[in-house]
């Protein structure tokens, strides 16, 4: 499997390069050249698997044997979804005959991002040991990414983790999860501004040509984050639908990573009908889908800080998938500023 940048300024790269860089050199986001496809027969087989095995089967197609031998990757999947997630990795509350709530808070930090970041941390640890290198991780958070990234990556002695968060704009619980974590390789930095300011600083660091350290991303700008989120779409689908009929998902959306994972799941063959983008007052995506216009506004502080975002990074991946035009993507994001 090879990956390309949404902005076209870089040759095809390997999974390992995507993992260790996060952001493409031209400022774009990495996407796979192709996507694994599952037939109806494949889906029936997948529906009987436990979560760790399902993770392995759904995501192994994104990883070449030359990057991580699949027998080793399978061990990583089983190591990830162990006692850290409790006996019920995911549970679903039934509201009515056709309505369910997917609960994704059974990870170690009670955030849905644990599902991808625990996997990402273990993949990092494997690759860093294999290559005998160390890594500095840089992330921006509005709350849940920070604590989940810290917990997911802190067990590796080869990783230093720096998390930027907007001062006074994350929940008190998540602030404490980040700032009271006892590990000499973890650094949390409060920034005067909002999440978009933090995310811009992260992207600026990655675009700084003179950087002398191995720098990687844990935000959903890193493709591996998206890859890890595919699995619970498959898992939840198989729990609520036994006859392979289509199902719709309503997804609270900030940086567009979660709902984009649903979109990719559909591309891979999962029978998803609609993906409904749910927002708060920071409704740039809602406005875009209603009007076709993407215009930045001042970020409004709400009780759902993970959605207090104006620049939804992963939306770039969706635009690229629809257009396949790197020139268009570059021009659009230059205009967006």
Language-model region placement:
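PLP-dependent amino-acid enzyme catalytic core
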Residues: 1-337
């Amino acid at each position: 499997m090879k990956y390309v940048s949404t902005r076209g300024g870089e040759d095809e790269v390997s999974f390992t390069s995507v993992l260790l860089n996060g952001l493409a050199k031209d400022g774009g986001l990495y996407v796979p050249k192709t996507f694994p496809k599952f037939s109806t027969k494949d889906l029936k087989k997948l529906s009987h698997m436990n979560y760790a095995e399902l993770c392995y089967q759904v995501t192994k197609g994104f990883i070449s044997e030359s990057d991580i031998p699949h027998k080793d990757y399978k061990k990583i999947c089983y190591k990830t979804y162990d006692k850290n997630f409790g006996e019920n990795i995911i549970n679903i509350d039934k509201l009515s005959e056709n309505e369910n709530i997917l609960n994704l808070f059974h990870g170690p930090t009670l955030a849905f991002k644990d599902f991808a970041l625990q996997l990402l941390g273990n993949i990092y640890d494997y690759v860093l040991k294999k290559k005998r290198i160390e890594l500095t991780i840089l992330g921006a958070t509005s709350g849940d990414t920070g604590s989940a990234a810290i917990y997911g990556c802190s067990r590796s002695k080869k990783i230093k983790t720096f998390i930027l968060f907007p001062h006074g704009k994350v929940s008190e619980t998540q602030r404490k999860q980040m700032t009271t974590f006892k590990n000499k390789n973890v650094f949390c930095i409060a920034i005067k501004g909002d999440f978009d300011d933090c995310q811009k600083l992260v992207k600026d660091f990655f675009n700084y040509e003179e950087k002398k350290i191995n720098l990687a991303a844990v935000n959903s700008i890193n493709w591996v984050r998206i890859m890890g989120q595919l699995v619970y779409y498959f898992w939840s689908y198989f729990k609520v639908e036994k006859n392979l009929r289509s199902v719709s998902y309503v997804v609270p959306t900030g940086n567009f990573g979660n709902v984009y994972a649903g979109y990719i799941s559909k591309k891979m063959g999962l029978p998803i009908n609609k993906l409904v983008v749910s927002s708060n007052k920071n409704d740039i995506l809602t406005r875009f889908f209603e009007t076709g216009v993407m215009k930045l506004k001042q970020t409004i502080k709400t009780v759902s800080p993970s959605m207090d975002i104006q620049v939804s990074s992963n939306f770039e991946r969706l635009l690229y998938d629809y257009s396949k035009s790197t020139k268009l993507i570059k021009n659009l994001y230059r205009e967006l500023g």
